[in-house]
Amino acid sequence: MLVVPAIDLFRGKVARMIKGRKENTIFYEKDPVELVEKLIEEGFTLIHVVDLSNAIENSGENLPVLEKLSEFAEHIQIGGGIRSLDYAEKLRKLGYRRQIVSSKVLEDPSFLKSLREIDVEPVFSLDTRGGRVAFKGWLAEEEIDPVSLLKRLKEYGLEEIVHTEIEKDGTLQEHDFSLTKKIAIEAEVKVLAAGGISSENSLKTAQKVHTETNGLLKGVIVGRAFLEGILTVEVMKRYAR
């Protein structure tokens, strides 16, 4: 099972937004480049980096940080405001192959195929709040059945998703794996679970679901609990495979 540390960037700094709300932003006095380098040295093979400024405000203020982080691009899945082929290609030229996309894919599913044509490995971000699918930096929502949506996107080459429970994101509440498990099994896609991966109990449950889904639950993304030391690097490594 993959355990993926998460680093969100806002105003050029490491940050977390509780439930995805800008007014509930927590900033951390951590250097993002040093943090990523240390995690790779500790043996983590994948780091989740999201440009919140670009996702929410369509701002390029974090680009200098992304350029510095590109040294470690092979270990990073990058997301946040990837809504055009031009921007995806710009990130690809920096070395970022694994890119997280959402809003543009909901508007135009063929975007998945277009990304593969420029050697990008797209990962769809399925963000849910109370059973509704959210997009545009979680500022908009729509009543869409997640499983039906994913089955349709598979026709365009979808293979893997990140499923975030927005109501749990950044709250340190426990992730409810029942919906994540249902999505993985019924849609037959690989899933990284996010939002509420907040304790060792979360990791134990994830490991159990990983086995029950024959690996379709590929792993978990750990954000605030990691940044605040609630889940230490040592504990996360214990569950990482």
UniProtKB/Swiss-Prot annotation:
InterPro entries associated with the record: Aldolase_TIM, His_biosynth, HisA_bact_arch, Isoase_HisA-like, Isoase_HisA-like_bact, RibuloseP-bd_barrel
Q: Mutating D8N leads to what result?
A: Loss of activity
Residues annotated as catalytic: D8 (proton acceptor), D127 (proton donor)
Task: Name the pathway.
Answer: Amino-acid biosynthesis; L-histidine biosynthesis; L-histidine from 5-phospho-alpha-D-ribose 1-diphosphate: step 4/9
Pfam family membership, one: His_biosynth
**Superkingdom of source:** Bacteria
Assembly: Monomer.
Question: Family per UniProt?
Answer: Belongs to the HisA/HisF family.
Question: Protein name, please?
Answer: 1-(5-phosphoribosyl)-5-[(5-phosphoribosylamino)methylideneamino] imidazole-4-carboxamide isomerase
Organism expressing this protein natively: Thermotoga maritima (strain ATCC 43589 / DSM 3109 / JCM 10099 / NBRC 100826 / MSB8)
